[in-house]
Amino acid sequence: YKWQLIPATAYLEYERTGNRKIMEVPYDANRQALNTLMLAELAEGKGRFIDQLLNGAYMSCEMNSWVLSAHLPRQSSKRSLPDFREQIIDLGSGGYGALMAWVHYFFRKPFDKINPVVSLQTY
């Protein structure tokens, strides 16, 4: 899977035009890929998907927020770029957090063998 970057302009598109899809399509694809890779590795158990899981977990931790752009105007700034200084939650970010908790729970040990920084971020 090729992890998709969500640029600032994808978040801003909601504020500019009301288009949520430009941010949500890659967000949903990345989240679905992480979920699928987790289930595939749990089913197979051969380590074939660990590197991609590590990439997805690391990339997810690098995001300022897992909240959808259409819900970010709930921040005090009322803007659509995530402000790392203010934490808000929506159903999508709650689901993403739950997925990351499962990824951490099941794959902490294999991640630690590669580099413990990823497990520290997902904790």
Cite the ranges covered by each PLM segment.
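Low-complexity, Ser/Thr/Pro/Gly-enriched N-terminal "stalk/linker" regions
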Residues: 1-15
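Intrinsically disordered, low-complexity acidic/Q/S/K-rich activation/interaction tracts characteristic
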Residues: 18-19
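Aromatic-lined, polymer-binding surfaces characteristic
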Residues: 24-123
